[in-house]
Regions:
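Flexible "cap/lid" loop of the alpha/beta hydrolase fold
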Residues: 94-95, 100-131
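Conserved small/polar residues in nucleotide/adenosyl-binding loops
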Residues: 252-255
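Conserved HGGG/HGGXW glycine-rich cap/lid loop of the alpha/beta-hydrolase fold
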Residues: 4-50
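Conserved serine/cysteine hydrolase catalytic core
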Residues: 172-210
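Catalytic histidine-centered segment of alpha/beta-hydrolase-like enzymes
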Residues: 223-236
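Gly/Ala-rich beta-loop-alpha elbow adjacent to hydrolase catalytic centers
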Residues: 80-85, 89
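Conserved alpha/beta-hydrolase catalytic His-Asp/Glu region
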Residues: 114-116, 132-185
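Active-site loop/oxyanion-hole signature of alpha/beta-hydrolase fold enzymes
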Residues: 41-78
Length: 255
């Protein structure tokens, strides 16, 4: 993995888990608005790191925890996960011994997919991600609701380093067809599973609500997948800070 940090390591820590097909730097626009108050940690999965080998989710978590330990992080003010980053974040939350005060999932991909289906879809995912590199972001509109120039560099960088073997290994132990991992009721009370009302991942909301009945499942009406985060990183960052500091979501920040 590769790690970027923003802010003073003495401040409360916020750990980001990025979406599929992008690098950890995709959280930079949000982290830059938090860095005055928080220590932001942005890991990039080994899947998108040149010369690195993806082993397993457990190994990814080990690398994250090793980095947090080296940085002197003893607790996390918040874990923020976007799209498929939810899969790794959930594994982290259920395995880490570090206290986690809040968690926020933005359009989490809480899919439960059979092994055979994951294996079949891997070549298509690989081609889609690599095509973003080959076309310098020109094919983004074909796989996402927007093709903003501001986010293309993160897709291009990820596609450049992606290997088929690493993606195949990641898909072999991601989005597995099994019950969601358990979260304590106390952590659920401080966890937010947010979905945009018009995004495809909205279909996972009911299953999430049933698995984590004490959690919060806000809906951003009229918003697409990760739209608030992409189009208004400042507002998104302010919302995260409000959750961390007031333990509630500030709906006035979402218009």
């Amino acid at each position: 993995m590769l790690f970027q940090t923003y802010g003073d390591s003495r401040n409360p820590a916020v750990l980001f888990f990025h979406a599929m097909g992008v690098t950890g730097a995709s959280s930079e626009p949000v982290a830059k608005y938090l860095q005055d108050r928080y220590f932001c940690i942005l890991p990039t999965s080994t899947v998108y790191c040149a010369g690195q080998k993806y082993v397993s989710k457990a190994d990814e978590i080990r690398q994250v925890e090793d980095f947090l330990h080296r940085q002197g992080v003893e607790r996390l003010a918040m874990v923020v996960a976007s799209s498929i980053g939810a899969d790794l974040a959930m594994a982290f939350l259920t395995q880490t011994k570090l206290p986690v005060e809040h968690a926020f999932f933005d359009g989490g991909q809480f899919a439960q997919i059979g092994k055979g289906t994951r294996r079949i879809t891997t070549p298509f995912l690989y081609f889609a991600i690599k095509s973003l590199y080959w076309s310098k972001g020109g094919t983004l509109k074909k796989i996402l609701w927007c093709d903003d120039d501001s986010i293309k560099p993160y897709f291009i960088a990820a596609g450049e380093n992606l290997t088929y073997t690493n993606l195949r290994r990641q898909m072999a132990d991601s989005l597995e067809y099994k019950p969601f991992p358990p979260l304590s009721k106390e952590l659920q009370k401080h966890t937010y599973f947010e979905f945009g009302s018009i995004e495809d991942h909205f279909k996972y909301r009911q299953a999430v609500m049933e698995a984590y009945p004490c959690g919060h499942c806000p809906v951003f009406e009229g918003y697409n997948h990760m739209q608030y985060q992409i189009r208004d990183p400042k507002g998104f960052a302010e919302m995260l800070a409000h959750i961390a500091e007031c333990d509630c979501i500030d709906r006035k920040s979402v218009v």
